[in-house]
């Protein structure tokens, strides 16, 4: 059986990934953005794929856009997830909270990344990685920038005091 591709717009992802909590509750502004822009993936989703929305609230908008433009995707609501045995899930980003949410909605565990994999992604997304990566990206004299990862108030104070015009 061919897997159906499902796109999910979860703009709270970076915050959820940073927290690492399975029960993460994003701020109201992020929840509102996720709700209002749930159909954002229709603009880049592959032909014949689905876009997740919490309810059919967005269906009228999608139908109107499909009348005007060639948008060959369909809406899938959260209650429909449990009845889909084969999904290729493509969120904005994976985190423990999204994994728990989808599992709670009945998505088969085999379709979700493991907590171990999410932990690896979380570690690879940490700011400390960008500090070591930035020098590797400076390929010639036209590339610039420095990155620091400071963890303690003492480090912050020392950093500011050692630089003229900092802040």
Identify the role of each PLM range.
Residues 2-43, 47:
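N-terminal-proximal low-complexity accessory segments that begin disordered
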Residues 1-5, 85-88:
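A short, charged/proline- and glycine-enriched loop
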Residues 30-44, 52-164:
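Conserved N-proximal alpha/beta basic substrate-recognition cap immediately N-terminal to
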Residues 167:
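Conserved, well-structured core segments that form the ligand-binding/active-site neighborhood
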């Amino acid at each position: 059986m061919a897997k159906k591709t499902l796109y999910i717009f979860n703009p709270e992802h970076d915050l959820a990934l940073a927290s690492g909590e399975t029960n993460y509750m994003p701020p109201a502004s992020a929840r509102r953005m996720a709700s209002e822009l749930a159909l954002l993936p229709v603009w880049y989703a592959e032909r014949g794929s689905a876009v997740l929305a919490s309810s059919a609230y967005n269906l009228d908008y999608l139908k109107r856009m499909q009348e005007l433009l060639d948008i060959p995707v369909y809406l899938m609501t959260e209650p429909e997830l449990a009845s889909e045995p084969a999904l290729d899930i493509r969120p904005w980003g994976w985190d423990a909270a999204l994994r728990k949410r989808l599992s709670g909605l009945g998505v088969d565990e085999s379709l979700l990344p493991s907590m171990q994999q999410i932990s690896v992604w979380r570690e690879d997304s940490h700011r400390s990685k960008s500090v070591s990566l930035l020098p590797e990206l400076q390929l010639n004299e036209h590339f610039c920038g420095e990155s620091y990862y400071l963890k303690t108030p003492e480090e912050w104070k020392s950093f500011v005091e050692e630089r003229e015009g900092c802040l």
